A protein has these predicted regions:
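Inter-motif core of Ras-like GTPase G domains
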Residues: 131-148
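Hydrophobic positions on the alpha1 helix immediately C-terminal to the Walker A/P-loop
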Residues: 48
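Conserved small/polar residues in nucleotide/adenosyl-binding loops
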Residues: 152-154
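Nucleotide-state-sensitive switch-loop elements of NTP-binding domains
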Residues: 9-22, 32, 52-134
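Hydrophobic anchor at the beta1->P-loop junction of P-loop NTPases
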Residues: 37
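Conserved lysine of the Walker
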Residues: 45
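Charged, amphipathic alpha-helical linker segments immediately N-terminal to NTP-binding catalytic cores
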Residues: 1-11
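The conserved Walker
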Residues: 41
Length: 154
């Protein structure tokens, strides 16, 4: 049996991180704070946003809604009269289980950044992949359901 060792000398996410920095620069120029909201599917990200988005006082929220396909969550949030941009990973992105910086970059032109103070990126429901990909956010938050608490080690 022949063995070959390959030495990785570059971070595989360098390209993603470069685009994430460009996203961050765009958000900073517009004065927009960005939260990347992550969780397992069905943990309650959308329900949490339905409850919180209307109680932000003078803060003008916007949502970038990530899903593999469909617009159910985006439709729920749009009913709150909050600007929502749907980003499906299935068409053109191969049905990815997360949003990456390039996907977010493709959605920036559809966002009215001048009308938003806080952009919440509701990432695709997945506990593994989203944490690996920076998208240009200021902060990340995790939503966990009660049944998942035994899986989380802090």
């Amino acid at each position: 049996m022949h063995r070959v060792k390959v030495r990785v000398v570059e971070d595989a996410l360098d390209a993603n991180n470069t685009i994430a920095r460009a996203n961050r620069d765009d958000f900073d120029r517009a004065g927009v704070r960005v939260l990347n909201l992550m969780s397992a599917p069905g943990s309650g990200k959308t329900s949490l946003l339905e409850r919180v988005l209307g109680d932000l006082g003078e803060v003008r929220p916007g949502v970038l809604e990530g899903d593999v396909q469909g617009s159910y969550d985006a439709d729920r949030l749009a009913s709150l009269h909050v600007p929502v941009t749907q980003l499906n990973t299935d068409p053109g992105f191969g049905g990815e289980c997360h949003l990456d910086a390039n996907m977010v970059r493709s959605a920036i032109p559809a966002l009215s950044l001048d009308d938003i103070d806080l952009l919440v990126i509701e990432n695709v429901g997945n506990l593994v992949c989203p944490a690996e990909f920076r998208v240009g956010e200021d902060a990340r938050a995790m939503v966990s359901s009660v049944t998942e608490l035994s899986l989380i080690h802090i």
